[in-house]
Amino acid sequence: MTYNPGRRDSFKKMILGGAALGSLASLDFKQNPSLTLKGNINHGVCAWSMRPLSLEQLCAQIKSVGVGAIDLISPANWDLLKKYDIHCSMCNGAEISIADGFNETNFHAQLEKNYLELIPLVQKAGYKNVIAFSGNRRGMDDETGLKNCEIGIKKILSLAEKHGVILTMELLNSRVDHKDYMCDKSAWGIELCKRIASENFKLLFDIYHMQIDEGDIIRTIRNNHQYFGHYHTAGNPGRNDLDENQEINYPPIMQAIVDSGFNGYVSHEFIPKGENKIAALGHAVQVCDV
């Protein structure tokens, strides 16, 4: 997940620009009623990466390419998703920012307030996953960050458990896109999961980010899938299409996810290089259809 300006700000601009792009949907993609997928992967998409399509344009088109959910949507836009019978596969709105997260205790009071307000809304809307971030290191060592994250997350964990909501911390690379981010290695995130020891706290395993920071994707999934509650895709390098110009071999990775018994969502978070965003999304779905 990479965004500049902030993903939330970019998404607001995308929504506001929707009316001006009203005719784009009909130009971008013709529905394919004959599309047949194996159905082993539940596909989602991150709306910010498909701009300039508005959220409504995205909702109206994604089912035609086998996508039934959208990530990183806040309560203000849930009704729009429901209008098109699109699931919110990862809710947001409680986080402060990627840089300001649970690893710093001075953010705990605000985070606790935000998540305690959001969690009941997520359950009421019929959703399950809520995004969370570790925050940046700012000179902090791994152990201090783990202890602080455990303290902060446990303040909201009982409410998440009560409402059947899963707090999902994203693994992001710190080499290229998110310099200084603390939860940048799967081992660190897995250790946090072990300390929290709840089925209501998981990791968002972003395949693109972990390819950059550590590689060994399939082995990591096979050995640690019980800690992963959600997945993201994108091509590397460049964070673009899942095509032959990038290095990640997605079909066997998807097979490892299927073999693990995972029944959550794999959401595509790449920035299409071409103008036809929906066609690029459809191609990604077919690449990952195992």
Region locations from a protein language model:
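Histidine-acidic metal/acid-base catalytic patches
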Residues: 2-42, 47-63, 126-129, 183-205, ...
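Active-site-adjacent beta->alpha loops and helix N-cap segments on the catalytic face
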Residues: 78-82
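Active-site-proximal loop/turn and secondary-structure-junction residues that shape catalytic pockets
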Residues: 49-51, 74-76, 94-96, 136-138, ...
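N-terminal small/glycine-rich loop or linker at the start of catalytic domains
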Residues: 34-46, 90-101, 135-137
